[in-house]
From Swiss-Prot:
GO cellular-component term (any): proteasome core complex, alpha-subunit complex
Matches recorded under InterPro entries: Ntn_hydrolases_N (IPR029055), Proteasome_alpha (IPR050115), Proteasome_alpha-type (IPR023332), Proteasome_asu_arc (IPR019982), Proteasome_asu_N (IPR000426), Proteasome_sua/b (IPR001353)
Entries under Gene3D superfamilies matching the protein: Glutamine Phosphoribosylpyrophosphate, subunit 1, domain 1
Name of this protein: Proteasome subunit alpha
Entry's Gene Ontology BP terms: proteasomal protein catabolic process; ubiquitin-dependent protein catabolic process
Record's keyword terms, sorted: Cytoplasm, Proteasome
Self-association and partners: The 20S proteasome core is composed of 14 alpha and 14 beta subunits that assemble into four stacked heptameric rings, resulting in a barrel-shaped structure. The two inner rings, each composed of seven catalytic beta subunits, are sandwiched by two outer rings, each composed of seven alpha subunits. The catalytic chamber with the active sites is on the inside of the barrel. Has a gated structure, the ends of the cylinder being occluded by the N-termini of the alpha-subunits. Is capped at one or both ends by the proteasome regulatory ATPase, PAN.
Record-stated family: Belongs to the peptidase T1A family.
Name of the encoding gene: psmA
Subcellular location: Cytoplasm
């Protein structure tokens, strides 16, 4: 975004709107999300799937040691695109809020409320001086009371929305196009995982391939109501089916 001298004041100040209604620092935080590894979530009647790509920035990087899918509580997990350090802080906060809710109310926290808690923190960092917005978007998914699958995404601005399927990061646009054409609500959980994998594969450049080290997968199915992560062997077996 090229800015002239008149716009530079709005560019530098997080709490001042530009004449066209923009908060430039929040807009830049969205750019950090777009630069992140491709990440997506899919919700069907059978459950919720979260999937995250992992890329080697250098041949010496051990991607097996990088975590991109996180359990927040027994029934809910999340993933993110953007600044990993920002994501880690928000995930730790979400985990503490979920645990606190269990201790006080003796029941799991609702997924929408947990997402709101995360989003409230993000929103607060868009209107105070001396801080910057969180340069990360989180996709939160799991199974609520009554075996209700839930999938939501929080933006750097603090806004959050429910989705049937959502994709963010470098390949977010291409993955979203694939999901719009191929999404079906009545898929079983394995078919939902395969749909998410194919959406990620649609973002790859010619000659690139997915393997068990370059993707991380988590899911929650309505039958068990719990969030799980696929093992290396399970990821490898699924990739052979594509």
């Amino acid at each position: 975004m090229a800015l002239g001298p008149a716009a530079m004041g709005y560019d530098r100040a997080i709490t001042i709107f530009s004449p066209d209604g923009s908060l430039y620092q929040v807009d830049y935080a969205f750019e950090a999300v777009k630069r992140g590894w491709t990440t997506l979530g899919v919700k069907t009647k059978s459950g919720v799937v979260l999937l995250a790509e992992k890329r080697k920035a250098t041949q010496l990087l051990d991607v097996d040691g990088i975590e991109k899918i996180f359990m927040l509580d027994d029934h809910v997990g999340c993933t993110f695109a953007g600044l990993a350090s920002d994501g880690r802080i928000l995930i730790d906060y979400a985990r503490s809020q979920a645990l606190q809710h269990r201790l006080i109310y003796d029941e799991p926290i609702s997924i929408e409320y947990l997402t709101k808690v995360i989003s409230d923190v993000k929103q607060a960092y868009t209107q105070h001086g001396g801080v910057r917005p969180f340069g990360v978007a989180l996709i939160v998914g799991g199974i609520d009371k009554g075996k209700q699958p839930k999938l939501l995404m929080t933006e750097p601005s603090g806004q959050f929305m429910p989705y049937y399927a959502v994709a963010i990061g470098q390949g977010g646009y291409t993955a979203t196009e694939y999901l719009e054409k191929n999404y079906k609500e009545d898929l079983d959980i394995q078919s939902t995982i395969l749909l998410a994998l194919r959406a990620l594969m649609a973002t790859l450049k010619p000659g690139e391939k997915l393997n068990y080290s370059s993707v991380e997968i988590g899911y929650a199915d309505v039958d068990s109501g719990t969030f799980k992560k696929l093992t290396t062997e399970e990821r490898s077996d699924l990739l052979q089916k594509i």
